[in-house]
A protein has these predicted regions:
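A general structural motif
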Residues: 1, 47-49
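Conserved "right-hand" nucleotidyltransferase catalytic core of DNA-directed polymerases
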Residues: 1-9, 21, 103-108, 124, ...
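Short amphipathic alpha-helix with an adjacent loop that forms part of the alpha/beta core around
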Residues: 39-45
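Generic structural signal of hydrophobic/aromatic residues within well-ordered alpha-helices
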Residues: 41, 83, 113-117, 207, ...
């Protein structure tokens, strides 16, 4: 089974602002190769039996589809961010127990690639890079490093993920649908909702009337408390 682990670097963080994918780093578990020509890396991703990446359902695959609408990967998609959240839901406890030597406290409990870079002793290169407008050596190194971290992370997670394939597949499909809803919204039947509201209101009125008949108001006369009773809210002579 051909498996490709990948990462891309774009010129913007928001999908709608992306106008260019600078580079794509690919690995089949061995050396990581960097591509800048989409005609080279797009077919590899499309034809792979399995594609793996970190946060690719929410970002990378969406970004590629944004610029290349005909992009249609045929293989299975595995997002290590989702798998990590599934299998390491107690990551904050793990971090405090391990007390990673070089890991900043603000990284504790996070599932970002930068955080996993510290945990796997493969620190993310140029994590503080701010300029994504043009392709640079730093951006290329960052892209390749992200893939190297993802490869190492997936090697750790894969044995556990393989033991629960249905759960992993379900999470991937669910994340894909949620991602689509976040971008496109979802249909809402306004007419049907109003009809349902009217039907519920009518039933509530019917139930209210039945309750009034079943439990009628009882006139107990006038009651004047002789002394204060804080628990019942009584005030003497009132």
């Amino acid at each position: 089974m051909s498996m490709i682990i990948f990462d891309i670097e774009t010129n913007a963080l928001k999908i709608d602002d992306i106008t260019k994918i600078h580079c794509c780093a690919l690995s089949n578990g061995g050396d990581t190769v960097l591509y800048t020509d989409p005609d080279e890396w797009l077919p590899i991703l499309e034809n792979a039996e399995v594609i793996v990446g970190h946060n690719i359902i929410q970002y990378d695959l969406v970004a590629i589809k944004h610029l290349y609408p005909k992009f249609n990967p045929k293989g299975k998609v595995i997002d290590t961010l989702i798998v990590a959240r599934m299998l390491r839901s107690n990551i904050l406890d793990i971090d405090f127990k391990k007390k990673w030597r070089d890991m900043p406290m603000q990284m504790y409990g996070r599932h970002s690639l930068e955080a996993y870079g510290y945990r796997l002793h493969l620190n993310k290169k140029h994590a503080d890079l701010q300029d994504f407008s043009v392709l640079s050596k730093e951006l290329e190194e960052r892209c390749k490093c992200d893939v190297d971290v993802t490869v190492k992370l997936w090697n750790r997670l894969q044995p556990e993920a393989n033991a629960i394939p249905y759960a992993v597949d379900l999470e991937m499909r669910f994340a894909t649908l949620i991602s689509k809803q976040e971008r496109s919204g979802f249909a809402f039947d306004v007419k049907g909702a109003l009809e349902l509201e009217a039907m519920i209101a009518e039933k509530l009125n019917t139930l209210d009337e039945r309750l009034r008949q079943r439990f009628p108001f009882i006139d107990g006369g006038i009651f004047t408390p002789k002394r204060d009773n804080q628990s019942r809210g009584y005030i003497a002579s009132c």
